[in-house]
Amino acid sequence: MDGFSRRILWLEVVHSNNDPKVPASFYLNQVKELGGCPLLLVSDCGTENGIAAAMQCTFRAEDQDELHVAGEKSHRYCSSLANQRIEGWWSFYRRNRSNWWISLFKDMVDYGLLHLGNALHMECLWFCFSRLLQDDLNKVRDHWNSHKISKSAYSAIHGVPDVMYFLPEYYAHEECAISVSEEQTKEMEVHCQGEVDGSLYEEYFEYVLETEGRVYPGTVKEALTLYQHIIKLQNE
């Protein structure tokens, strides 16, 4: 999330966020897209943010500025509770959307359809629902970025995140991104990676779709039906 505009920059479904290379890849992709890095990067204290923090400090290693947030000071760890902007957003998301998904998966557990300790079940759940989850996240992100945020106790500046992000001068502010060259970003690519696709489970699930003439589910009902069908095949 951009600190000034509160615009969501990326919102991605991944197998796990414990691998620091995964969030680092999202951070680096954003730097490439913008051609620059933030003046200051703030993250919680989880070890998964270590590589992104190191990249930020490297990009700003030679900088000097009046705010004294260059070099190693260009990244700051803070507790989740202290980062009110992003914590407020996660609260918004949970109230308005994620509780629905959580309830769905809990119901699957309660009805004996999903066993959390079963690798096949978890991989099948990912295969059947991950694209739908990502589509849902994209809609939530786009809605948030295009709606008007009301004035709050944490920020006197308010408006539409997309407008604030792309037109900061309209709010008497200026673009603060620090230029990063293509050469610099290429040097960092070795330190991050996207999610690894093509597991044996996924190959099998794709085989089932192909041999039975099925298509990837486009609705939650279709995803649940496919999930139950694949699990049933394995139990026969």
Across the structure, where does each feature detected by a protein language model lie?
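Protein C-terminal end segments and domain termini
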Residues: 149-236
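RNase H-like DDE/DDD metal-dependent nuclease/strand-transfer catalytic core used by mobile genetic elements
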Residues: 2-154, 207-236
